[in-house]
Amino acid sequence: PDEHRADAWLLLSGAAQKRNEQPGLYATLLAAGRMRPEDLQVEEQIDRDLHRTFPGHPALTDAFCQRIKNVLLAYSARNPEVAYCQGMNFVTAAILMFVRAEDSAFWLLSHVVEEVLVDHYVQSMLGHQVDQQVLEQLLEQQLPHVGGHLRTLSLSVPFITTQWFLCLFLNALPSETCFRVWDLIFCLHRCTLFQVSVALFGAMEDHSLLDTSDIGPA
C-alpha cells in the first residue's frame, strides 16, 4: 500500500540505515551544494529541468519543486563525478511523492545512483552501456525475434530502453505498475531492471507491436 511504501523502500534498500549512521550529512551537503563555481552550473541545469519534470502534475507545486532541487543539489555535493544528470529529476520527484523527509529521499536517490544504476549517470555512461549490452544478450537468448524486428526498423535496443533505465520505467509504465516495479528494485536490486525490460519486450511481441510485416519502402 502507498502509505507503507516509503518505509519499505527505505528499509529494503538500506537507505534508512545509512541515514541513521550519518545524521546531519544531508544538511551539510545541501549547504555545500552552492559553494563552488561549478555548483552554480549544476543549479542552473536543475532549474531548467524542473519545469520539464512531470509537467502538469498537480503535486509539482513551487514548494515541491524546491524540495526536488534541494535533494539534487545535496547529491551533487556528495558525488561530484555525477553531479546532476537528466533522469535524476524524475527519479527524485517520484521518490518525494512517497517520502516526506528530504534527507530520506536523498539517501534513496543515493541508493539508486550508486547501487542500482551504477555508472549510468556519469559522463561516460559506461555502466549504462554495459547494462544495455547485457540486455541485448538476454533478448537474443529469450526473445530472438525481437532483435530481428528492431534491425528491420533500423532501431537499436538502447534507442528504446535508455530512458527506461535512466528514469526507472517512469516513462514506460502506468504509475501504479511502475511503483510496483520500484518495490522489486528496492527489494531485489539490479536484476529487476533486466527482468522488467525483457517482459516489456515480450509483451510488445505478443501484441504485435514489433511486427514489421506491413512495413515497406516509402
Region locations from a protein language model:
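Helix-rich, well-folded core regions that mediate interactions or catalysis
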Residues: 1-218
